[in-house]
Amino acid sequence: MIKIVFICIILLYISFLCKHQIKEFFDPDSTNDSTNNSTNILGTKLEICSTDPMTGFHRKGYCKTGPEDKGTHTVCATVTDEFLEFTKSMGNDLSTPRDNFPGLKDGDKWCLCELRWQQGVHNGYITDVDLKATNSKTRPSIRYEIEALNLQEFLQEELNILKNKIF
């Protein structure tokens, strides 16, 4: 019985995530539509990532992008000290204050370059991602990676709840 409930929870969560992405899966060019720039990867209105520190390629708090944003800064993530050290070692120092930039510290939310976020994950530096503030313009392959990590976290939480109810 518990297995059936657990499987149903998984299927509901997957269908929720996939509901908004079927079009992009079959038509990847649909993500180039300028109207998608204001939606998140869940298909709803893009929420603000951070105003303290002020983030976003255009420094308006949102992970919006455009042709001038060569790094595609669309992933809203909470950075860790470990991730900041990693990105510094890769040539992108986000922790040192500079002109009009306070420098990031552990726990700050920031619009990350999608490929740098992916490099961090592949090197073991996983950061929490705010799905509601991560832009739908994020590449589908990276979006699926983000969702897989969030699904894993969600399932672990559900499993812990079920364990507590049983024992």
Language-model-derived ranges and their functions:
Residues 136-167:
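Glycine- and charge-enriched low-complexity intrinsically disordered segments
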Residues 1-22:
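Single-pass alpha-helical membrane anchors
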Residues 93-100:
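Short alpha-helix capping/helix-loop boundary micro-motifs
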Residues 117-140:
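Short, compositionally biased
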Residues 77-93:
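Short, basic/aromatic beta-hairpin or loop at an interaction surface
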